[in-house]
């Protein structure tokens, strides 16, 4: 008859304690680098956002009359039904022109340190003015926008309520502030990763935890950290090795166009990775459709590493855990134009 050996109590306890310690260490490491998405944003630059501003901004966000053609709205390129982006390489603008860069998601953009791939807008209010005036995008002017909105009594009343202290309520600046107020509501809390950061260890599965560890240990989190896992700082694309010209077109020098500083050539804002599984294609060029390919390219270009296939798969699984609760948006009824509203133009 075989005799059985009993595992010493200390060894038994240690065998249970080791995985728990490893789990705690992973959570502690992640908590030092990342923060969960807040449930809502109630103020901008220390000022409370009013309901009147949000509701006005929502209508303006969806109103194509802000464009010269009356065809394009903010939602055209930042579609709230498709992850806050438009899922094409570069957006189609006025007269079927194609923009030079992929449209970033509007979801959680309020948490970015600056807007656009090159950071040329300091906040969402400043960002809102850019596409409207860009001849490739909405091809309008501040004067035309003010004339359009001022010709619609319902908008005039809404601007007065949203900006009661303004000497000129219907203005291009206030339009941008209202859009910013609405866009600040477009946040996606309670992703599996958010729940994990808040203490729910079971919110991530085993593969996603492996991916999180690989993401941090490989160096991805050096650029992609904070609330948005990116969007906070600028880095050269091709820090170690330049990617193919299709991914990094030579004609787009990134932040150099803003600063005119040679060291900023091919420097871009680190892409926020929240909801990244929903916002293909990837990179400012919009030339990479598969998340696994984007991860492999970043390993080569930024880290100088040929990531192992298992690491790529695990990181992709982790990135899927960044998809949060999508905003439930009811399309607004827009006020009718009047006889004095400027007509669409080519």
Swiss-Prot record:
Tell me which PROSITE patterns the record gives.
CYTC
Report the EC code(s) recorded for this entry: 1.11.1.5
One Pfam entry for this protein is: CCP_MauG
Signal sequence: where?
Answer: 1-23
Q: Where in the cell is it found?
A: Periplasm
What biological function has been recorded for the protein in this entry?
Catalyzes the peroxidative oxidation of azurin and cytochrome c551. Likely to provide protection against toxic peroxides.
Q: What is this protein called?
A: Cytochrome c551 peroxidase
Could you tell me which species this protein originates from? Pseudomonas aeruginosa (strain ATCC 15692 / DSM 22644 / CIP 104116 / JCM 14847 / LMG 12228 / 1C / PRS 101 / PAO1)
């Amino acid at each position: 008859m075989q005799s059985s050996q009993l595992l010493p109590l200390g060894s038994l306890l240690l065998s249970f304690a080791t995985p728990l310690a490893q789990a705690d260490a992973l959570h502690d490491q992640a908590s030092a680098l990342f923060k969960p998405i807040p449930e809502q944003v109630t103020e901008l630059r220390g000022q409370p956002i009013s309901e009147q501003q949000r509701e006005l901004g929502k209508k303006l966000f969806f109103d194509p009359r802000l464009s010269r053609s009356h065809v394009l709205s903010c939602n055209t390129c930042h579609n709230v039904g498709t992850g806050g982006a438009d899922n094409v390489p570069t957006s189609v603008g006025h007269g079927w022109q194609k923009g030079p860069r992929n449209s970033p998601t509007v979801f959680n953009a309020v948490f970015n340190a600056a807007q656009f791939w090159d950071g040329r807008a300091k906040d969402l209010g400043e960002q809102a003015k850019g596409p409207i005036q860009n001849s490739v995008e909405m091809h309008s002017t501040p004067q035309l926008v003010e004339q359009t909105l001022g010709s619609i009594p319902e908008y005039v009343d809404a601007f007065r309520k949203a900006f009661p202290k303004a000497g000129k309520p219907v203005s291009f600046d206030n339009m941008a502030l209202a859009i910013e107020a609405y866009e600040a509501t477009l946040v996606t809390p309670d992703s599996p990763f958010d729940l994990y950061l808040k203490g729910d260890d079971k919110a991530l599965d085993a593969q996603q935890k492996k991916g999180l560890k690989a993401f941090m240990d490989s160096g991805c989190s050096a650029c992609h950290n904070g609330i948005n896992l990116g969007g906070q700082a600028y880095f050269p694309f091709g820090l170690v090795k330049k990617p193919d010209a299709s991914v990094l077109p030579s004609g787009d020098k990134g932040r150099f166009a803003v600063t005119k500083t040679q060291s900023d050539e091919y420097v871009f804002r680190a892409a926020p990775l929240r909801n990244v599984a929903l916002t293909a294609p990837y990179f400012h060029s919009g030339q990479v459709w598969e998340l696994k390919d984007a991860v492999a390219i970043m390993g080569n270009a930024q880290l100088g590493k040929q990531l192992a296939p298992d690491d790529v798969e695990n990181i992709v699984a982790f990135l899927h855990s960044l998809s949060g609760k999508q905003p439930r948006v009811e399309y607004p009824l827009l006020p009718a134009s009047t006889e004095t509203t400027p007509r669409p133009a080519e």
